[in-house]
Amino acid sequence: MDPVERLIAAESPERAEHVLVVNAPGLVEAARRAAPRVSLWCDDRRDAGTVPTGLLLEDFDESSLAGVDLVWLRLPKALSALDDDAERIAAWADPRVRVVSAGRQRAMTHSMNDVLGRHFDTVSASLGVAKCRALRASGPRRRRLRWPRERTHPELGIGVIAHGEVFATNRVDDGTRLLAELCPDIHGDELLDLGCGSGVLATLLARANPGARVRAVDVSRAAVASTLLTAEANGVAVEAHWAAALHDWPPECLDVIVTNPPFHRGIAKDSEPALAMFDDAARLLRPGGRMWCVHNSHLPWRRRLAEKVGPTAVVRQNPFYTVTRSVAR
């Protein structure tokens, strides 16, 4: 267990009937000592791969949460993600449910208390321990679910539906928008949105390429679900996959890859996921296939893409974001 997980366990009631562990796989063994029944929800495929599959929930829904009387939750970075999780727990868990959540103090704000307070009658905070702090909640308020949420973007001609865990939720962030404006002119028979988020790029590619096979991949369950909802709402077909790597995909199977790669994992900056995505692209693109990438302009991705994928040119740029096109060797 890391310090956040240790604090969750330390601040928890000694016993429960059914513990649900949310995005904190290191707590599984402690949960087994605390309750006869344990379930685990992992949004991130990389976390899910570290625990026994028999504990993993297939969905975070009413049937999965029924009877849960204790929730151990790692606080997410985004308030929207906490709001989405909290409203489902409050709506569907046992009326006696107690939530013990924690995070690193540098990443916490008082707004997290406010979010929990929208869904629970009682919210309290622990003292700081090892630069972490716990938030406890009880007394769930049963309310109509507000997630996932839809927003129309007339300038792109689409609506976006997203869960709270998805980056930018149902908005279109400035980087994605810069690449999205090019999607009507990106064509191929086999296309992939790598790190699909809410499915904006995949949906636009499917619209621009009727009859083509458009796939989308993300490590986040919420992103995959949101992509499917967004595609369906816009009347296009997209195959969405929950995956952390594409080792099982055959080489040279794609004509086009588009991506807005992450450079954070949680609250920590991490370039490795983006570099791994570039490696996947190099293997999956057919010779002459194209990779379209949008990234923060200060990052050295043009050079890394040229090294890993092939000749790379800047297609569009502003002071904040750059779109590059790489041609696979």
Write out the residue ranges for each language-model feature.
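Short SAM/SAH-binding signature in class I
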Residues: 68-74, 254-262, 292
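N-terminal auxiliary segments of SAM/dcSAM-dependent transferases
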Residues: 79-154
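A short helix->loop->beta-strand "cap" motif at the edges of active sites that frequently abuts
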Residues: 36, 94-97, 211-212, 289
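Conserved SAM/SAH cofactor-binding pocket of Class I
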Residues: 1-52, 174-259, 265
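SAM-dependent Rossmann-like transferase core, predominantly class I methyltransferases
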Residues: 130-190
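Short acidic low-complexity segments
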Residues: 56-67, 240-248
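Conserved Class I SAM-dependent methyltransferase catalytic core
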Residues: 86-87, 99-120, 127, 268-327
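General small-molecule cofactor/ligand-binding pocket signal
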Residues: 58, 100, 126, 161, ...
